């Protein structure tokens, strides 16, 4: 579901990748980056699908309006749980460059974009820019510079989605 791919595990992804940023568990971090990239692809595909169904079927467009508060409440619950997970992970203190407050801001920042992608306005407060600037280099495969013999190739994800696909082409 969209909540799973857009919000759930983002705190864990960021925490795990903070270790990589601190030159710890680099091998695991590379695998986690691949999993993160896969989740982002799923999120983008699911957002596209939600938007297409709403655009092409008036019944779904009507249902979206009728159920918006209920749908937002579901996403808000997941967001609240992710913030609780950040508090739990850092109850004994921060790691270099990361703490619960930064992660909770990151959850809010991520929520704004993810909800906007499906036509829902985030009702919380969020920073205007990412509180974890290094996170995107783990999402964007074009920013990785590794020799193929040193890492798995992530080229398979380039060009797999098109937002110009028409329903009849499917």
Set out the residue ranges of the language-model regions.
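Non-heme di-metal
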Residues: 1-170
């Amino acid at each position: 579901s969209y909540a799973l791919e857009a919000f759930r595990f983002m705190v864990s992804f960021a925490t795990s990748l903070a270790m990589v940023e601190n030159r710890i568990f680099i091998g695991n971090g590379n695998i986690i980056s691949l999993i993160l990239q896969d989740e982002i692809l799923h999120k983008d595909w699911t957002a596209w699908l939600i938007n297409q169904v709403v655009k092409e079927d008036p019944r779904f467009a009507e249902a979206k309006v009728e159920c918006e508060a209920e749908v937002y409440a579901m996403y808000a619950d997941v967001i609240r749980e992710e913030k609780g997970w950040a508090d739990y992970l850092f109850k004994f203190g921060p790691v270099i460059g990361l703490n619960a407050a930064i992660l909770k801001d990151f959850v809010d920042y991520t929520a704004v974009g993810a909800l906007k992608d499906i036509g829902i306005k985030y009702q919380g407060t969020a920073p205007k820019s990412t509180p974890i600037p290094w996170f995107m280099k783990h999402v964007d495969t074009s920013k990785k510079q590794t020799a193929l013999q040193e890492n798995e190739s992530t080229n398979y994800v380039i060009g797999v989605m098109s937002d110009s696909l028409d329903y009849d082409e499917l």
